[in-house]
Amino acid sequence: MSVDTSSFGRAIASARKALQLSQKDLAKKILKEEDGEPITPQYLNDIEHDRRSPSSDHIVKQFAMVLKISPDVLYWLAGRVPGDLLTRQNVSSRQIDQAFMAFRRALKEK
């Protein structure tokens, strides 16, 4: 499935449409971590129109799972760093710099 990667919201909307899900149907499948309740269709609409961003890593992972999109792609589009990378211990500034340089090189090869 090809997903519009111009923004987080557009990626969510294009993947949802490719799976033939309504906003209401998708919203029911995305459960908030705090209370296990689904997000509202209005919140989803705001996300799809880039008026709001996902509120947590949990929401990003839920979208990835339901819409069959790589979580890393969604983190990138949301402008977020996955929580598991933020909590890594003993990572030097040199390692971080090298990782970002490799990432930038890979994007240029496109």
Model-derived regions, located:
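Short, basic-rich loop-to-helix N-cap that marks the start of a DNA-contacting helix
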Residues: 38, 49-65
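Short alpha-helical DNA-recognition segment
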Residues: 20-46
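The DNA-recognition helices of helix-turn-helix-type DNA-binding domains
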Residues: 33-34, 51, 77-82
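Alpha-helical residues within the helix-turn-helix
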Residues: 17, 28, 65
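Interfacial/linker helices and their anchor residues that mediate assembly or domain coupling
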Residues: 78-110
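A short, Lys/Arg-rich alpha-helix, primarily the initiator
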Residues: 1-21
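DNA major-groove recognition helix of helix-turn-helix
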Residues: 30, 48, 59, 78
